[in-house]
Curated annotation (Swiss-Prot):
Taxonomic path: Eukaryota, Metazoa, Chordata, Craniata, Vertebrata
An MF annotation (GO) of this entry: NADH dehydrogenase (ubiquinone) activity
Quaternary structure and interacting proteins, as annotated: Core subunit of respiratory chain NADH dehydrogenase (Complex I) which is composed of 45 different subunits.
Membrane-spanning parts: 1-21, 29-49, 61-81
GO cellular component: mitochondrial inner membrane; respiratory chain complex I
Disulfide bonds: none
Similarity-based family: Belongs to the complex I subunit 4L family.
Gene: MT-ND4L
EC number in record: 7.1.1.2
GO biological process: ATP synthesis coupled electron transport
Keyword flag Oxidoreductase: no
Keyword Hydrolase: no
Protein name: NADH-ubiquinone oxidoreductase chain 4L
PANTHER family: NADH-UBIQUINONE OXIDOREDUCTASE CHAIN 4L (PTHR11434:SF0), NADH-UBIQUINONE OXIDOREDUCTASE SUBUNIT ND4L (PTHR11434)
Organism: Choloepus didactylus (Southern two-toed sloth)
Amino acid sequence: MPSTYINILLAFTMALLGLLLYRSHMMSSLLCLEGLMLALFILSTLMALNTHHTLSAVLPIVLMVFAACEAALGLALLVMVSNTYGLDYVQNLNLLQC
């Protein structure tokens, strides 16, 4: 396995570990999710370039669209929670349940 793939998998693992460890604040969780999506995007792009299939080139674009939607929804939720409660703790999301 080339060192490029090892570095990308290490970045994915570190972002996943950060998501598991720093889940108390919403902003840090969103940053770790963006790191996960970026590592997946780079890995899927490299895989699409190495396989030389036309259909596999669509996957990174779809993944980037979902990452942009996730970032927009996450930031909207962060703004709403911080304006309502004044904090960005994830525990405040339990208060939003009906």
